[in-house]
Amino acid sequence: MKPYFFALFAALFLLSCNSTSTQSDVTAVLQWDTVSGVSAGTLLRLDSSHTKGTISARPLDVWLPSTYDGKRKHAVLYMYDGQMLFDANSTWNHQEWRVDEIMDSLIAIKTTLPTIIVALHHGGVMRNFEYFPQKPFQTLRAQFSDSTMAAIASRYGSDTAFPVKSDAYLHYMVDVVKPLVDATFQVYSDKSATAVAGSSMGGLMSMYAIGEYPEVFGTALCMSTHWPGGFSPNEEIPNAFQKYLSENITPDRVGKIYFDYGTETLDAMYEPFQNQVNSVLEANGFISGERWVTQKFPGAAHDEKSWAKRLHIPLTFAFAKQR
């Protein structure tokens, strides 16, 4: 991997965080490596030192489209499960979202704004605990929440459940990653050009991100949203999410929000819950087809190949060219 430096912007970012930062700190923290394996654009990787203890150490990836020249400003999409987005040769299931090809193509035909992708890595076995919306979780009965988290931990090979840390993850996104991205790259920093996206638990986190930080994220793209929360049928978790939606995802607070679901594999669970969510959004005053969209994709499964096939739809919803 080849190093890629942003010395001036790195210095500005670090000095804003810590007035005692040295030039060696700047070099160590903001040396980006160019990562191979993408089919379009350029993928850069920052080492794990940037996390500053906000979450467990992990790298950060930023994808730059072919249009990126360091002069013209771009919109920004923050995406969860960053390990799964670009290269099927490096993913656990040998599938990928094909985000690089799809986004680059949409930009090339002038369907969407020029946009960079910030690929946020999950924490491996901690993924579900990082992506479970914390405020709804805290409303669950203790016995139920404990058993649910224990079952999730067991499913992923852990004897012990981790604490739910989605608030800390959002703090990492908003207070560490976004200032770094805004200082380093030529991007619009306003919420109208800033979106968040994910699938499954990442869909839940996208909803939670715009609910907690509507002043930061103007659009949330929630694909195959995992409304059951765990892996057993239940009503308590979906009800907690719907209460959160009723109180926080309202037209006067948030910009635009997109939901979708398939009908196969894990997605087969979602339609009844998504219909309930649709009713909550309508009661809140959203009008379908305007700032809120829900789409059903018959035959689509709960995997990266299915999400890649329809990714152009939410990307266009978020970044339709208008600037």
PLM region spans:
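Sec-dependent N-terminal signal peptides
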Residues: 6-9
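Non-catalytic cap/lid and distal C-terminal segments of serine-dependent acyl enzymes
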Residues: 21-323
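C-terminal motif of bacterial Sec signal peptides marking the signal peptidase cleavage site
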Residues: 14-16
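Positively charged n-region of N-terminal signal peptides that target proteins for export
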Residues: 1-4
